[in-house]
């Protein structure tokens, strides 16, 4: 069932998302997002709530059609994950043309309108405005404008260029229905052998903090709004000090060392991201080794599972109240 544009008795126009002929509070455009969300949550089943807690990879069909077979990476048909599993957050991979991207996004939203409460889909993406083509890390620009990698942008040493890039990328994302960015990556690569440096902005904590502020301003604006692209900043609390330069995507690269009290140095850009209102935060796959804060040992447990890191530090000490997004397939 597709929702209809209806008129309430008082003349308010609204979209009847659940098709019951009544303007329920979550459909009332006059209410705040918080009020509408509270009403919607009270209507959802446990299964529907569970579906909203996951985000998976999704792929386009030919020329923007919905892919109804398993893809190269996505494991289920599109209708299965939306109508069957109640999922509404997806990380899009290859987009061949802007037309296909926009057409696919519209098709996806029309499918989501058939769910019991008409919850729209949120599409996210890894960086896709530069040259690197490495699935799970970044995509080359393709139909989007092409810019230097983040390390190259940082090397220009011009915050206005960073802000302009982010604003242009925001507009291009919105044009094809992408409203969430799985970036910026603000890790400080203090281990020069680490293989994920190209998507960082270097190892100067103060300068990276300034770049982060400009980046978030370009994508999100002064505050999240209808024209924003919501950013998920990564990889909390800093994914750069990888032991021997290995990477935590692999079991042999999970250890992160902070010699000489460098943990706070790596944390500095994330403090700025929180101050600037980043919508999301992504912990890394890695785990701290031999780390103490204020004389208290930090458990040698993966950051995304680490209560001392996610709850005590990120939520309580730093006051982050946005969405925590785990890195991909943390549980599989």
What are these regions (language model features)?
Residues 1-332:
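Glycoside hydrolase catalytic-domain context in secreted enzymes
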């Amino acid at each position: 069932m597709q929702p209809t544009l209806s008129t309430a008795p008082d003349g308010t126009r609204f979209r009847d998302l659940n098709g019951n002929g009544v303007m329920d509070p979550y459909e009332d455009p006059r209410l705040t997002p918080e009020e509408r969300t509270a009403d919607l949550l009270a209507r959802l089943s446990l299964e529907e709530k569970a579906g909203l807690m996951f985000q998976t990879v999704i792929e386009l069909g030919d020329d923007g059609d919905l892919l109804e077979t398993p893809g190269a990476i996505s494991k289920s048909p599109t209708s299965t994950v939306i109508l069957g599993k109640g999922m509404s957050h997806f990380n899009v991979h290859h987009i061949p043309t802007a037309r296909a991207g926009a057409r696919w996004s519209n098709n996806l939203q029309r499918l989501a309108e058939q769910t019991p409460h008409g919850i729209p889909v949120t599409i996210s993406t890894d960086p896709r405005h530069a040259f690197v083509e490495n699935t799970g890390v970044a995509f080359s620009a393709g139909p989007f404008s092409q810019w230097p990698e983040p390390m190259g942008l940082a090397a220009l040493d011009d915050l206005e260029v960073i802000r302009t890039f982010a604003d242009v990328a925001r507009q291009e994302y919105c044009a094809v229905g992408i409203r969430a960015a799985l970036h910026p990556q603000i890790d400080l690569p203090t281990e020069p052998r680490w293989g994920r440096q190209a998507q960082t902005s270097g190892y100067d904590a103060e300068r990276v903090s300034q770049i982060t502020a400009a980046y978030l301003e370009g994508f999100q604006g002064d505050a999240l709004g209808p024209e924003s692209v919501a950013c998920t900043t990564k990889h909390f609390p800093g994914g750069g000090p990888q032991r021997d330069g290995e990477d935590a995507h692999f079991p042999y690269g999970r250890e992160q060392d902070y010699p000489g009290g460098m943990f706070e140095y790596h944390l500095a850009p994330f403090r700025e991201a929180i101050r600037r209102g980043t919508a999301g935060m992504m912990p890394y796959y890695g785990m701290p080794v031999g780390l103490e804060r204020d004389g208290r040992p930090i458990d040698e447990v993966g950051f995304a599972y680490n209560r001392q890191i996610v709850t005590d530090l990120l939520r309580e000490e730093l006051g982050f109240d946005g969405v925590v997004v785990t890195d991909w397939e943390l549980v599989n």
